[in-house]
Amino acid sequence: MLIEDIFKALADTTRLRIARLLGTMELAVGELAQVLGQSQPRVSRHVGILCDAGLAERRREGSWVFLRQSEARGEVIEAIQHLLVTAEAEEPAFAALCEADRRKLAAIRQARE
């Protein structure tokens, strides 16, 4: 995958939020849709772009599709996660989105248990 494809895939706030969430745990598309407050088809489209760029991977379990960070691009993924953590620390608007996402994700994790 070309670096240009990776940057294009990350050139959207929703996809940045998805990448940040996948850095914490594996999630189903429906769970991502809940956290992001967007429709499942819309989230699936964003996930497809991340997968096409090699930044995320799908895993099927029955009728569920789970997503996780790509393991094939370890150093690239690590650098992207570092960049996202730094952006969250320095960009108040992105930090607010990430904090809201974490609160919603915590509720989803609790429901899983």
Task: Give residue ranges: language-model regions.
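Beta-hairpin "wing" of winged helix-turn-helix
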Residues: 52-61, 68-70
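Positively charged, low-complexity intrinsically disordered regions
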Residues: 43-46, 59, 110
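Amphipathic alpha-helical dimerization/coiled-coil segments
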Residues: 2, 75-113
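Alpha-helical residues within the helix-turn-helix
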Residues: 34, 45, 51-52
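N-terminal helix-turn-helix DNA-binding core of bacterial DNA-binding proteins
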Residues: 2-41, 64-74
